[in-house]
Regions:
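Recognition helix of helix-turn-helix/homeodomain-like DNA-binding domains
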Residues: 23-38
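Short, solvent-exposed alpha-helical "recognition" segments
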Residues: 37-41, 67-68
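Acidic-residue sensor for enzyme active/binding pockets
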Residues: 14-15, 32, 54-56
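Short, charged recognition helix plus adjacent turn
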Residues: 30, 48, 56-74
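Short basic helix-loop element that most often maps to the first helix and adjoining turn
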Residues: 1-20, 45, 71-73
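DNA major-groove recognition helix of helix-turn-helix/homeodomain DNA-binding modules
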Residues: 22, 41-56
Length: 74
């Protein structure tokens, strides 16, 4: 599942996540689009916030980055 879908399933906006984690909205957007990986210190808080496992967050983040790499390489 994509990070954006996980966030939306949790009923959260990017702004909500940014505020809870004390990061910029652009950081959350970049994570979801695969522009930047999620720093390890945010994996557990994101998982708790979204109500999923850390493994699911890592998998979604990796998939976003792989998709981005595929687009950039095309």
């Amino acid at each position: 599942m994509e990070l954006k879908a996980i966030r939306e399933n949790a009923g959260l906006r990017q702004e909500d996540v940014a505020k809870k984690l004390r990061v910029r909205v652009s950081a959350v957007s970049n994570w979801e689009r695969g522009v930047n990986g999620i720093a390890s210190k945010y994996i557990r808080p994101l998982a708790r916030l979204y109500g999923v496992t850390e493994t699911e967050i890592r998998a979604a983040s990796g998939a976003a980055q792989a998709a981005r790499a595929g687009k950039d390489g095309a």
